[in-house]
């Protein structure tokens, strides 16, 4: 005999049926079932490989030797001080 015995579950079930009604519970059950089916379908679709793999794009032309594409770079600029507005309640 744990905290929730089978008798407790029956009482909870009766209270839920009285509060929500059978129509809402049927609708909720069908919505949950459809959600589970959709989830399973999506999971199965992810497992299957694509039927026709997309053709791989041709490689772009190599960058010239002096190009800094892969080199780290620094932006030289100065920060400007921002004037914060004065709060009226502090004056």
Curated annotation (Swiss-Prot):
One of its GO terms (biological process) is protein transport by the Tat complex. The keyword 4Fe-4S does not apply. It comes from the Bacteria. GO terms for cellular component: TAT protein transport complex. Its main location: membrane. Residues 42-91 are annotated as: Disordered. It holds the Pfam family TatA_B_E. GO terms for molecular function: protein transmembrane transporter activity. Signal peptide: none annotated. It is found in: Cell inner membrane. Residues 78-91 have a biased composition (Basic and acidic residues). Residues 51-65 have a biased composition (Low complexity). The chain crosses the membrane at residues 1-21. It is a single-pass membrane protein. Keywords: Cell inner membrane, Cell membrane, Membrane, Protein transport, Translocation, Transmembrane, Transmembrane helix, Transport. Part of the twin-arginine translocation (Tat) system that transports large folded proteins containing a characteristic twin-arginine motif in their signal peptide across membranes. TatA could form the protein-conducting channel of the Tat system. Belongs to the TatA/E family. The Tat system comprises two distinct complexes: a TatABC complex, containing multiple copies of TatA, TatB and TatC subunits, and a separate TatA complex, containing only TatA subunits. Substrates initially bind to the TatABC complex, which probably triggers association of the separate TatA complex to form the active translocon. This is Sec-independent protein translocase protein TatA. It comes from Pseudomonas savastanoi pv. phaseolicola (strain 1448A / Race 6). The gene is tatA.
């Amino acid at each position: 005999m744990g905290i929730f015995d089978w008798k407790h579950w029956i009482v909870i079930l009766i209270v839920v049926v009285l509060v929500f009604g059978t129509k809402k519970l049927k609708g909720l059950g069908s919505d949950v079932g459809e959600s589970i089916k959709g989830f399973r379908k999506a999971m199965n679709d992810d497992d299957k490989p694509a039927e026709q793999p997309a053709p791989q794009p041709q490689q772009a032309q190599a960058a010239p030797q002096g190009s800094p594409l892969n080199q780290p770079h620094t932006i030289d600029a100065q920060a400007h001080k921002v004037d914060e507005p004065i709060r009226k309640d502090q004056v």
